Design a protein with these regions (language model features):
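Mid-domain Rossmann-like dinucleotide-binding core that forms the NAD(H)/NADP(H) cofactor-binding site
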Residues: 109-110, 116-118, 122-207, 211
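Conserved amphipathic alpha-helix within the SDR
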Residues: 209-219
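A residue-level detector for short acidic-glycine micro-motifs
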Residues: 2, 33-37, 160
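Glycine-rich beta-strand-centered segment in the early N-terminal region that forms part
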Residues: 12-64, 68-69, 77-79, 122-124
Length: 278
């Protein structure tokens, strides 16, 4: 199980969640038991699987519409109360008192995951190397494929190139982006960004982001700007480098309740869109 930055927000109290709890939603491992009533034939004891940080019910209005990222029961039961769909947690202390689960509570030795939230992984891939698939990789893919609806030949910028941002670079390049610009404050991350698909890099500490991106794009700005940190400053950067008709796709979760300013007239007159993706 990996440790996501949102886990750190919960640990620090910036994201409210019941306590005591077990965190961890970047999971992969081996099935040791199948619950009663399991109907799917794709899963078997001894099989390696990767889990998804979202655990959609598969039955609500959002799930039926293909928007499992908006699953109402998941957010009402798990994210607010720390329980699974039967209203119960699977974790307790030695005295039998409940310990709440953030997603599946993957940092425990064993975890219970709904069948809708796991997928088999090939035998030649180890669980250690595939734990990231259900969070950083899935979040990045959803942002590029569904959030931005990236089209071949478009220009892309990624503001903040950590775990999710780096995966966005890779997916954007694979899906046909003509330019992929990485923006960060860390030169080491920007060097790594080149290996993930970035065609250009900008250090936000030493370079004016808008001027640099406008020069790289012949004065137009980027068609899609992804914001992967969840801070007002990076929101402003992403909006500031956006082309007319462009889409800004924020992915990063902020620490607690934060707000970013949006220039109303520019957004309206230039037909720019802000499309959240989770």
């Amino acid at each position: 199980c990996g440790l996501c930055h949102s886990d750190l927000h919960v640990l620090g109290g910036a994201i409210a969640f019941p306590t005591p709890c077990v965190l961890g939603h970047e999971v992969s491992g081996t099935i040791v038991e199948l619950g009663p009533g399991m109907l799917t034939g794709e899963l078997a004891v001894g099989q390696n699987v990767a889990g998804a940080f979202l655990m959609p019910c598969g039955q609500c209005k959002a799930c039926r519409a293909g928007r499992d990222d908006l699953c109402y029961p998941f957010f009402q039961l798990n994210r607010l109360k720390g329980v699974l769909y039967d209203g119960e947690t699977r974790l307790s202390d030695r005295d039998g008192n409940p310990i709440w689960m953030y997603s599946m509570g993957g940092l425990a030795e064993y975890c219970v995951v709904p069948a809708t939230s796991v997928t088999p992984i090939p035998d030649n891939l180890s669980p250690k190397n595939t734990a990231i698939l259900g969070c950083a990789a899935m979040t990045a893919y959803g942002a590029v494929r569904r959030g931005a609806d990236l089209r071949f030949g478009e220009t892309v910028a990624v503001v903040a190139t950590g775990g999710v941002g780096s995966m966005i670079l890779k997916f954007a390049k694979v899906m046909g982006a003509r330019q992929v610009i990485a923006l960060d404050v860390d030169d080491d991350k920007l060097t790594a960004a080149r290996t993930m698909g970035a065609t250009h890099t900008v250090n936000l500490l030493t370079t004016n982001a808008r001027e640099a991106v406008m020069e790289m794009t012949d004065g137009y700005g980027v068609d899609v700007a992804f914001e992967a940190l969840g801070r007002p400053a990076t929101w402003n950067t992403a909006l500031d480098i956006l082309a007319d008709g462009g889409r800004m796709v924020p992915i990063g979760l902020g620490a607690g309740v934060q707000s970013a300013e949006v220039q109303i007239n520019r957004t309206v007159r230039r037909s720019q869109s802000i499309i959240g993706s989770y």
